[in-house]
Amino acid sequence: MTNQTTSIPLHDRIRLIRIQAFFRSATGNPFSLVLGGGLSALALTSVGVPSYPLRVWFALILLLSGLIFAFERFVKRRGLTQENAGSLFRRRVALGLVNAALFGGVIGLVPEGTAQTAYLLVFVVVSAVAALGYMSYATEFRYGLAVSVLTIAPYALFCFYRYFAQGDAFLLLTGIIALVWQAVVVSKALHVSRSAV
């Protein structure tokens, strides 16, 4: 161990290790999100959601995922050091949260009168994105929690809004299930995160 390494406080070294683990875990996620977004757009179109807004939504997912991929390659080339890790981590988190918000916002594209299947499809999508946030980034629980809030909360709130507007008990039940499911996932993710670095 060098003098330079030993001069770094322990909590700073642990923070660097956690950020390095975060970036390692992120490898491949942009492709997963593009694939998931594309399949979601096709599935939602098939159950009556208008195709044009879904194409725009998917184009934004594609663009942002491309930016994340390019940024991660930049970080890999540059390397993570004690000096740059914090700022690079914050930029990557910002990009990831914008992408999560896009996935969370897809529920707003479901028009009134659409088949209940559309709501279930969106639930599968946002749950998968939230789970990906927790599983891939166990060393950064707060990031996973933010992804969850940006994906599941809009979905549940939209279902509750539609329930009060339309009186469809299915939407009330779906919103409740989304919140209960996330409470279960959050508790498990917190346990895993505490056992990480």
What are these regions (language model features)?
Residues 1-22:
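Short, Lys/Arg-rich, polar N-terminal cytosolic tail immediately upstream
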Residues 18-28, 138-141:
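Membrane interfacial helix-start motif at the N-side
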Residues 80-96:
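Juxtamembrane helix-capping/reentrant segments at transmembrane boundaries
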Residues 95-187:
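Hydrophobic transmembrane alpha-helices
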